[in-house]
Amino acid sequence: MAVQVVQAVQAVHLESDAFLVCLNHALSTEKEEVMGLCIGELNDDTRSDSKFAYTGTEMRTVAEKVDAVRIVHIHSVIILRRSDKRKDRVEISPEQLSAASTEAERLAELTGRPMRVVGWYHSHPHITVWPSHVDVRTQAMYQMMDQGFVGLIFSCFIEDKNTKTGRVLYTCFQSIQAQKSSESLHGPRDFWSSSKHISIEGQKEEERYERIEIPIHIVPHVTIGKVCLESAVELPKILCQEEQDAYRRIHSLTHLDSVTKIHNGSVFTKNLCSQMSAVSGPLLQWLEDRLEQNQQHLRELQQEKEELMQELSSLE
């Protein structure tokens, strides 16, 4: 017997400027995972599709299904600063969540829309786009606080074996508690077992979670929003702060000799130069290109305005 899974979210709409910031962040480092938080709103889409004809009973059934559609709209993202840089692990501190909630409240006042933290994203450099058991368990923890919370993963630095070209894959997921029959229905690879145990009436029960993929759609934008632009500009600053923190933490050790300190300083300088070449330089060039494009568009609009004014004066 098939088990019906009730999804808290049916779709995610990610605006293209927020997608651009996530992509730039994921491609900023090849050795460690990066992370951030998504700011947006959760809407109940109650619109029905009038392109098809249904009978009365079918229409009621379709209307009930449509009324249940919940869509997460992601308008911007917040790039988080990593206190612990590890190859296969990212962590979000309560202080960062609190700061993100404060930023969401500021954006809500600025836009007049109910903005809040609706999800998180992180990168998978050189590995599969599918979430690990740690990702699924972390997502389940966030959903205990908010059922509409979603997780995004960007798999980057993946090379296609046939074409020898790089690829970037992305997915959106949520966690659900695995049914007892999940293993027999889908096989052991379709769910992830958590190592967390909870005590119920003196007995320990292992919680199992499985991922469920959420359809994600990129919403095109002609321009980049102010908030996303600020996040993109903030990326080099955050990467530089992470390098400074790591260098100061090592440099403060008292048992290091002079040669080791000189070596650490050289590594620190090399990392900063690499960031300038890989992140700051392309970002600056992109901003200059956008500025030139906007100025060209402004000149075209001014010329069009003058032509329309001339036509208007000739009619008088």
From Swiss-Prot:
Subcellular location field: Nucleus; Cytoplasm; Cytoplasm, Cytoskeleton, Spindle pole
InterPro entries documented for this protein: BRCC36_C, JAMM/MPN+_dom, JAMM_MPN+_peptidase_M67A, MPN, MPN_BRCC36
Modified residues (Phosphoserine): 258
Post-translational modification N-acetylalanine, affected residues: 2
Protein name: Lys-63-specific deubiquitinase BRCC36
Coiled-coil segments: none
GO CC annotation: BRCA1-A complex; BRISC complex; cytoplasm; nucleus; spindle pole
UniProt subunit comment: Component of the ARISC complex, at least composed of UIMC1/RAP80, ABRAXAS1, BRCC3/BRCC36, BABAM2 and BABAM1/NBA1. Component of the BRCA1-A complex, at least composed of BRCA1, BARD1, UIMC1/RAP80, ABRAXAS1, BRCC3/BRCC36, BABAM2 and BABAM1/NBA1. In the BRCA1-A complex, interacts directly with ABRAXAS1 and BABAM2. Component of the BRISC complex, at least composed of ABRAXAS2, BRCC3/BRCC36, BABAM2 and BABAM1/NBA1. Identified in a complex with SHMT2 and the other subunits of the BRISC complex. In the BRISC complex, interacts directly with ABRAXAS2. Identified in a complex with ABRAXAS2 and NUMA1.
Main location: nucleus
Record: residues binding Zn(2+): 122, 124, 135
Positions occupied by motif JAMM motif: 122-135
Keyword presence, Membrane: no
Necessary cofactors: Zn(2+)
Family: Belongs to the peptidase M67A family. BRCC36 subfamily.
UniProt function note: Metalloprotease that specifically cleaves 'Lys-63'-linked polyubiquitin chains. Does not have activity toward 'Lys-48'-linked polyubiquitin chains. Component of the BRCA1-A complex, a complex that specifically recognizes 'Lys-63'-linked ubiquitinated histones H2A and H2AX at DNA lesions sites, leading to target the BRCA1-BARD1 heterodimer to sites of DNA damage at double-strand breaks (DSBs). In the BRCA1-A complex, it specifically removes 'Lys-63'-linked ubiquitin on histones H2A and H2AX, antagonizing the RNF8-dependent ubiquitination at double-strand breaks (DSBs).
Alphabetical UniProt keywords: Acetylation, Cell cycle, Cell division, Chromatin regulator, Cytoplasm, Cytoskeleton, DNA damage, DNA repair, Hydrolase, Metal-binding, Metalloprotease, Mitosis, Nucleus, Phosphoprotein, Protease, Ubl conjugation pathway, Zinc
Entry-linked SMART domains: JAB_MPN
Main enzyme class: hydrolase
Molecular function as annotated in GO: cysteine-type deubiquitinase activity; metal ion binding; metal-dependent deubiquitinase activity; metallopeptidase activity; polyubiquitin modification-dependent protein binding
